[in-house]
Amino acid sequence: VLASPEVLVVTTPEPTSLTDSYSLLKSLYRNPKFNREYTKISVLSNRVTSAAEGRGVYDKLNTVVGQFLEGEITYAGMIPRDSALEKAIRMQKPVSLQAPLSKSARAFEVVAAELLQGESSDAYRSFGLSRLFSGFWKQKNEGVE
């Protein structure tokens, strides 16, 4: 995590998940090797019931990070909880391949597109999340699983 120019923290509305996410960020911000200017930290709210709940998850984490760590995090978006996502998890397959028209699969596409768009303006992040998502979408579009 310290070597990455981007960190994507995936959390859920459950209190234990928020606590774990904050603990990770706390250890990151307090590490002397962590470079705040070089690292972009984003939060993805996963398995939420609404866009408002997703934003609320981010707001809670952002408040404590700002107040106690004097840090900055951005909102990467949200992935809704739906039956297709639950089924894909049980089958151990990506929901974007298992049920590409589901709400959660579409949300993953929106989040990936926004992360890629944000990276195009940040040239120094050329080995960050855009590279990861570019490879995934290329494989998906070519039909490779």
What would you call each of these model-derived segments?
Residues 44-46, 91-98:
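Short hinge/gating elements
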Residues 1-77:
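Conserved catalytic-core segment of NTP-binding enzymes
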